[in-house]
């Protein structure tokens, strides 16, 4: 059995103009020790699908489906039990560590309070664990770092500290939401190497949410591509990214710069914009932007079905 099994996940959010569906029937699973990549443009539903599991959606949100984590349905258990799981068994790393870290509290206080609450350790043991995890994520001079404040660190170091807090209680699953977006390329590579090392050393499952297929290609074992609240293609990284079979996946890859081929190919922008959740077009949601649109694409919603080495929601193969 997978560590996390999500089936039929639907999320509706309340807006001034009525409820809108932002996640529409999503299925996926995550295995222990793997990195599961979730990619798509802004507004594709990738982050909302994870926040739904953790009870972190805005007030008034309606969530349907099942999300079984270690034999418990995260969508059905009491909120108090869910809060205990979040932090102890599931860690979360957000995009901007400057907003996820409290600017007025020392790093030591933020780490030790987290450990004391979830692991019920005394102050001395909590401080020892805090220093240990800072060392584990390669923070120089961990003892001094515990006395410092977030603004005293670079963006890359702050993100390492955020990862340390998320992993301080030795969770089984880490959800990392765009953890490298605000970082330069060199620091980004260091964070990805850190996540890869930690998951191998601790048999940690990682859900990596990103809009950058380049990031995902460097670390993910399996990937799911989201568009307009649905999964359109999913499978092993090498299959999906080396031979994409959904036009949207193909378009994302065509728009990705390849330094080694900078003088041999032009970047191809994806025409148009992702639809707003309140204005999803009929048929395939991607058809207004697709180079391979057929008449049926305008009226029929493609089902996500198993096709050879992946699951796919499109009858057209852009590489055929």
Model-identified regions with their sequence ranges:
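P-loop NTP-binding/switch modules centered on Walker-like glycine-rich loops
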Residues: 55, 175, 179, 183-265
